[in-house]
Amino acid sequence: KVAGCIKTVSVFPSNLKAAHDSFLIAVNYAREKKNLEKLKCEAVATAAPIIKKFPKVEKIYKSIKNKYSYSNDKYAIVLPDGITDIVLDGMLLGHCTYRTDRYYDRISTNESYIVFLRKTSDTEMPWYTLEIEPGGTVRQKRTFGDDQLSDLDEAMPFLFEWQSVVAGRLNKSDRIKAQKSKILRTE
């Protein structure tokens, strides 16, 4: 058991690679959780100049939260409250969302958004960071170490389910943004 992150351990898991990947994520999370308060302070400090540079982002997240949030009994799409949450998630998972302006620029123009894929059993534990387009297309899926691991395979049916739900929530303006985003992605 690693700081309460792993409930049971099977000596012979059916998918050894997925079990290994999940264990590594849990170990990293447990290690980072010890330093969580310090990391939160770092995230606030790191986010401050980004918030100043991209003031629309916080407002955009307030306006899209209900449209893109979704969960079932196993997984959840959780939207950040704003830039500080994205920075903290990037720090905890060790990927690039807090080290580049690219994502905040895309968010501020409604080209794409950063959302979090979590396990419903612990929506506070970072698992995957997704970059999504306004129509629900997933551009990127990244976990610990800026990687995409085999444990994501089990969540793919959920992501397709989420995309169907989101498609039903879109209005005309969202569809126009989705078309523009698709064009920008292919350029």
Regions found by a protein language model. Give the residues of each.
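Glycine-focused motif/segment detector
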Residues: 1-187
